[in-house]
Design a protein with these regions (language model features):
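Feature marks short, highly hydrophobic, charge-poor N-terminal signal-anchor/signal peptide-like helices
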Residues: 1-3
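Membrane-embedded catalytic scaffold of the fatty acid hydroxylase/desaturase
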Residues: 6-147
Length: 147
C-alpha cells in the first residue's frame, strides 16, 4: 500500500514540474527543444537512453531538470529508493518507445504515445508522466485529440 501512495505522490511531483516548465521562461526554452525535436526526429529507443541522455544537449538538460534530479530528490526525502530504479527502467528502456510512438495506446492506464503526443501538439494539455490521473484531477486532460 505504501508503494502505491509513494508512486502517486511522485507522479504528482512530476506532473507539477512538467506543467511548470511550460510557464517558467528559461525552462520553457529548454523543454521546447524536446517538443520540437521529438515531433520530427523521434526514432524510438537508442543506446544513449541508457545514460539518460537525449539526442540534443537542451533536451538532455530538460530531462535531468524535469525528471531525473527531482526523482533523486524525491527518493532521498522519502527514503523510497525503488522509485529511482523504476524511473531508470522507464526512462532508459521504455519511455522513447512508448511515449513518443503514436501507435502505442494503453490509455487510461499509462501516458503512452497517443496521449503524450497530444501534449506535443497542444501544450496546455496532457502533462502527466506515467499516468493521466493528475491531468484528470486538474482538468488538463485532452481525450478527443488522441482518437
Amino acid at each position: 500500500m505504501t508503494e502505491i501512495v509513494v508512486f502517486f505522490a511522485w507522479t504528482w511531483c512530476l506532473y507539477v514540474i512538467h506543467r511548470s516548465v511550460h510557464v517558467i521562461p528559461i525552462l520553457r526554452e529548454l523543454h521546447w527543444d524536446h517538443h520540437r525535436y521529438v515531433n520530427t526526429h523521434s526514432t524510438g529507443w537508442q543506446w544513449n537512453n541508457l545514460l539518460l541522455f537525449n539526442d540534443t544537449w537542451p533536451s538532455t538538460a530538460d530531462l535531468w531538470i524535469t525528471e531525473v534530479i527531482p526523482t533523486v530528490i524525491f527518493s532521498y526525502i522519502t527514503g523510497e529508493w525503488w522509485v529511482i530504479w523504476f524511473y531508470y527502467v522507464w526512462a532508459a528502456l521504455l519511455q522513447e518507445t512508448l511515449e513518443h510512438n503514436p501507435k502505442v495506446n494503453v490509455y487510461p492506464w499509462l501516458t503512452s504515445g497517443k496521449w503524450h503526443l497530444v501534449h506535443h501538439k497542444n501544450t496546455r494539455n496532457n502533462y502527466g508522466v506515467f499516468t493521466p490521473l493528475w491531468d484528470m484531477v486538474f482538468r488538463t486532460h485532452n481525450f478527443k485529440d488522441q482518437q
